[in-house]
Each structure stands twice: as C-alpha cells, then as structure tokens.
C-alpha cells in the first residue's frame, strides 16, 4: 500500500465500524453476567490505543465471541469469565513463544471453524430472541429471573476460585481457541497483507498471538472483557476509511473516557434498560456471525459438517462437544477417501 496522507475524518468514521459487534457483546457481559462496566470499558480503550500504536494499522479489538456468547447464554460467573481470559492469555502467549499457531490451525480445518461460527451465531440469535420476547420487562428483571444472578457489578478480586478456573476450560476456552487461532491470528494476518501490502507485514501471527495473550492477561486480572483481534473487524474498519492506527486511538479514547466518566452509573442504567433492546442487538450480531458460514455450503460434505457442528452446538449448548463431533465426522469421511485413493493406486500398479 502506498503511503497516503492521514485523513482524520475518514479515520474517525472507520474507527466506529466495528461497534456493531463490540458493543452488544460488551453490554451483554455487563448486564447479564455482572462484569464491571468501568474497568471493562477502560481496559478496552487502553487495549485499542496500545494496539493501534503498536501495529500502526487499524487492527481491531473485539470481545471473544464464543466465550462471550456462551457466558451470556449460560449465565457464567464473573470469576469464570476472568478464568477464561487467563486461560486464553496463557495459551496465546505459549503459541506466540513457540510459533505453533500455524500448525494448530491444521488441527482445526476451516470447515470446523465455520461450523462453530454457525453455532455461535445461532446461540446469539436464541439468546437475543429470549430477551426480545420479554417485551415489557427491564433487563435486570430478566437476568435475575433467568440465571438467578444480580445485574450488578462483580467483585474486583485478583483471581477466580479454583473451581471457576477449571470450569472455564471446557465451557469457555476450548470452543474459543480454534476461532481465535483461525480468525483472530491467521485470517487477520491475511487481511493485513491484502489491505495494506508491505505495511501489513508488521502484523504477524506471532505478534497477534502475543498481543491477544497480553490483553487477556490484563482482562483476567482486572475483570475486563476477554478480547481478540479479528479479520471481520479489520475489514469493517478498512471499509469505512480507516487506514492507520489513528482509528484505533480514536475509538480507544472514546471507550476510555466513557469508562472513566460513566462507568460507575452504567450498570444501574443497563439494568433498567428494556430487555428487548439488548435482545435485538444480540440477534443482529448473531445473524452476521452465522452468515460467516455461508461459503462452506458450496460443497455437500462441508455443508453437512457445518450444519452438524452448528446444530449440535445450538441444541446442546456445548460447543466443545460440537467440535469433537465435527472432528470425528471429518475423520470418518477422510478414511473412505484415503482407502479409495489407495485402491486406485493398487489397481494402476497391476
């Protein structure tokens, strides 16, 4: 990409492009799970600013979609969410240090990632529909009735309990890991090279894994929102005019100021908000996320795998089980194909 003059107006417009994903999931975690709004927004803002400063490109900062969706749908505790962030931090830093992100992606082929994306989207739509149907109720009333938890901020302790730490691994982390490696690391790297040419070479898989790991370490310790980068977010920023890290600094500053100025009163305001408002927002994000799987439906085998993983994830609420079933199906489909290739080789050798 040629060096272009910085256009602040375009950068500002581009900085807002990914709020349609960031805000509904962040608000959902605050309102439905008790994540503290002040620290969450402040940390999101700081992370965005540091990300833009480091990469000098509009690299997005987004909530971990699988983790956030499962947490909202199941009423996961603040401790479990923080434990999930700490798990992701350790895993991503390990991938950055070892350089194994590319190899791990081979374990989770794109078709399985598409199936998980479909399942997450359907779970978002279902969670949004439940909230939207509570037309006359406040969000606080619905959350307490559904999960038995108070829609007030959680504590600011330094660590989750041991039980929460181990529950978070199968519930929140394992379903999230292949999405993070496939989309937040490898696909984001591809987008950076496609959109920004030589300038995008700074956005390497190892660096992306490292910044995701460090951001989630901070989130786990302070009670913030677990985050990642993402190809979709980068495309959104780029499509509306963002070309430099200035866009990240702009949206990050807005989140930082909002967290400092209004964080203390935000939880009460959200609890009083009509439940259907968040329901519609979550359903909208769910539709967009499920639509990511559409490119897998040109092939019958891939389509069946995507549908199986997505439906199992929706009906069971267990994306880890859906991932395991999808892996087993791919293995069963691969064995007959391998036998057919071997038989054709034997026939030709005679």
Where are these regions (language model features)?
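Short, non-helical or kinked segments that cap or interrupt transmembrane helices
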Residues: 35-42, 56-68, 105-113, 226-233, ...
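Hydrophobic, membrane-inserted alpha-helices
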Residues: 21-27, 44-48, 65-70, 141-147, ...
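Transmembrane helix boundary and interhelical junction motifs in multipass membrane proteins
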Residues: 20-26, 60-68, 185-187, 224-233, ...
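Intrinsically disordered, low-complexity non-transmembrane regions of multi-pass membrane transporters
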Residues: 1-12, 148-159, 193, 200, ...
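Long hydrophobic alpha-helical segments that form multi-pass transmembrane helix bundles
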Residues: 137-184
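Membrane-embedded helical hairpins/re-entrant loop segments and their flanking transmembrane helices
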Residues: 2-13, 28-50, 175-245
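Membrane-embedded alpha-helical modules
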Residues: 75-150, 250-350
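Transmembrane helix-boundary motif of multi-pass solute transporters/channels
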Residues: 13-76
